Each structure stands twice: as C-alpha cells, then as structure tokens.
Amino acid sequence: MKFHIITLGCPKNTVDSEGMHGILTREGHTAVDSSDGADVVIVNTCSFINAAREETVGVLQELANNKAPGQKLIAAGCMAESHGDVLRSRVPKLDATLSTKEWMRIGSVVAGGVAPSKTTGFGIPLMGGAPSAMPSTGLNLSLTPAATGDSLGAYGDWRTTAITRNKRGPSAYLKISDGCNLRCAFCTIPSFKGDMRSKAVGSILGEARELVEAGVQEIILVAQHLTDYGRDLGMKQNGLGVLLEELAAVVPADRWIRLMYAYPQSVTPDLVETMARLPQLCHYVDMPLQHAHPDTLRRMRRPPDTDKTKAIVNSLRQAMPDLSLRTTFIVGYPGETRDEFKALLEFLEEMQFDRVGMFRYSLEPGTVAGELPDQVAERVKERRWNEAMAVQQVISRARTARFVGQTMKVLVEGTGTDDDGRAIVVGRSYRDAPEVDGLVFGYGAADVGQFAKIAINKTTDYDLWGEIV
C-alpha cells in the first residue's frame, strides 16, 4: 500500500511519525509525499491545548471530505488517546484511531489484522453507531497482534522502543523518554502519556548511529522532562549527563547535539560541566520556566524558588558564557494579579533571556488549573501578552546585536537569490532551534545540509545577516 503521514504538534510527535514510517516501510508499504494517491493517510494528532485540537479536527475533516474511493484515514497519537470519542463524532469518515500507546501496531492496522465481525473491509470497527468499548481507540487491539520487534531491539514499551529513523533534512529529533512524573496544574499530558519512561541508553545510541550514518548534522534530544532522563533506570540525578558522554562517542565532534525541554530543578553541576566540555553540545538550552512569581508558581504546582532558578541559570552562563537560553512563560494564569505579572516583567529584565515563547493561558477541562477561581479575562491576557512580548523584543534585539562582527558556524537549510539576483543561503546557528528561533542569512554559495561560516554584519530582532567566508 501507499501511505502518507501528516504530523501535527511537537517534535516528539515527529519522532513517533518516523517510527510509524519505519514500521510500514519495513513491511513493504511505500511512502508518498501527498495524501493524493495514498491508499492510507495517517494523521499524528496533537492534544496540547484546545487550539491544537481544533487544528487537528480541521485537518482530519478536510482529508475526510476529500477521501478518494477506497482510501483509509487513520488518526493516531495524542488526541486519538485523549479525545478519541470526539474525533469519531466530529470526523465520522475516520476509519480508525490509534492511541499514543499503540502506534507500534500501525502495521497491523494498515494490513487489516482484525476479525471481520462489525468491521469495514479494512479490518477495523465501523466508526458509526454505538460508542466503542475502548473510547480512545476505534480498533479492537485485542484482536491485533502486538508489535514483536524492530530493527534496533526488542519491543518492550511504546515509549522506550528504538525506531528506524526516516532521515529528512540535516537535523533530526531523538526522543529519549516519554511521559512525565510531574503534575503541573495546567497540563493534561500525563493523563494520556502516563509517567515518564526512559529509553535505554543502547537504544538511543543505536538511533544516533543510524542518524550519523545518514548524514544528519544536528541531533536534537527531546523529552517531556529531558533532565530527568534515566531516573527510572536507576541512574539517579545525572542520567542525562551520562547519556551525553555516551552520545559523544557516537556523534562526531564537528556535528551538533541540542537539548530541548530541560526542567530547571534537575540541572545538576555535573550536567553543566558535561555540557560545557563536550564539543558536540550546542551551548543552547530550552528551559521552560512558566512564571517568575512564587505564588503563581505554587498555583501551577511548579517549584516556587525563583532564587534557585536564577542560580541554575547563572551556573550555566558561567560555564558557557556564549550560552543561548530559551524559555517559555504563561501570562493570564488563574489568579495572576498585576503584581505577579509585574514580577514576571522584572524577571525578564533581570535574566535577559535570548528567546522567549510567551503563551496566553488556555483553560483545559479536567486540569486543576481549570477549576481554580479568579480566571483572568481574555482581554487582560491579551494585554499582558503584548506587554511582555514588547519587553522581551527589546532584550532579544540587544542579545542578537552582540554577534555583529563575529563569524558563526551555520547549518545551511536552504539556498536562493535575493531581489538583485545575488546568491543567498539560509540556516541556523547554535543559537537557533528549528522552527521556534531565528535564522541566519548569508550571501554566497554553500551546500544544503552542510555547515558554512558566515561573517555577521547585520542583525534584526531575531535573525542574523552576513557573508559566507
């Protein structure tokens, strides 16, 4: 069969989509670049907040409305797990939903390994009629054989299994764990991802070797709680540091390893030292902090000790003076007073983060935060978001301007010409994670997927400009 996978949401979903791609290609199916002409279309869904769920439904509805005769449509992943009944109700032309815990069975679903009673010809229960006995899946998984293995090791757990990598482009995400042991008041993820499970070091190294052999220049480590890696494997407090040492023996010194989603309270002195010492490690950390006022943080069920957070940030900057630090904050959280918001603005000014993702609080049914009193009005959220972004824009502009006169190592991701016909490349420096950060533009020629040196002579709020040297 020909299949096409559409991935919505975070990089962790990208990794799971690669896993499904690997399973299907190993079983003889063929990937195609468009839903047109595909026998099976798989959408790896997102359920992070309501806006993400609405986007998921919209994508599925459009695909359903344009289904070719005989074409099958599968919703996989987070929203299939958390709101499978909603998907089946709003997208009745869905042929199956496959939860986060079952994506390894995608081969059996596509092959139609289910008994024929009350099924379509595709081998899955019809979506109409009475509600399914398994509300998060439209497939009777008891009738579908469990995945028994993959190219890198025995299948043990849906979150910890190594996957065959489908290399697309010079960068690749590598998920080292899934699930989360934290219970932040605003977050639904543990309710459908479960507690954290770390992938075995050997499995991670196997994936990394495959990516290196495929020519990937940048490996981006992702997890729900990156810095807690290995705790469930008995690695205590420095599991991530131990893993990085092992990865450094696999990834050449001239390539990049990037860390995303590092929880601040789990950053140890040993980890800081390891990051500063290993040449592969980008001096970059994405460290979601969410707020800066102790009272707000307590309501969020986050560590309220902002002094400790400052000490951790300072230790990272002392070890790596060129560190690029990204974080995220939520404004308009229930009960956020003007004084609490002012504390956040002061924190931005004091800490001088390179990049900030600012989010307006989104009420999620079923969360502790959703039941809190003093929900903040939408107009107040919008005003505070604009105010905070204005403060951070000035900071980001100044942080970026420091690089004028420097020569940056840039991973080239595209080439073209400007309005005058001059050759130009676009890529990212160590300061820039894919999609969420800035870009580097350089006049001259270079190969896509390789590193180039660009002498910086101009900056904007978030981007760098220069000449290839």
Swiss-Prot record:
This is Ribosomal protein uS12 methylthiotransferase RimO. Its cofactor is [4Fe-4S] cluster. Pfam families: Radical_SAM, TRAM_2, UPF0004. It catalyses: L-aspartate(89)-[ribosomal protein uS12]-hydrogen + (sulfur carrier)-SH + AH2 + 2 S-adenosyl-L-methionine = 3-methylsulfanyl-L-aspartate(89)-[ribosomal protein uS12]-hydrogen + (sulfur carrier)-H + 5'-deoxyadenosine + L-methionine + A + S-adenosyl-L-homocysteine + 2 H(+). Catalyzes the methylthiolation of an aspartic acid residue of ribosomal protein uS12. Binds 2 [4Fe-4S] clusters. One cluster is coordinated with 3 cysteines and an exchangeable S-adenosyl-L-methionine. [4Fe-4S] cluster 1 binds at C10, C46, C78. It is an enzyme of class 2 (transferase). [4Fe-4S] cluster 2 binds at C180, C184, C187. The lineage of its organism: Bacteria, Bacillati, Chloroflexota, Chloroflexia, Herpetosiphonales. The gene is rimO. NCBIfam families: 30S ribosomal protein S12 methylthiotransferase RimO, MiaB/RimO family radical SAM methylthiotransferase.
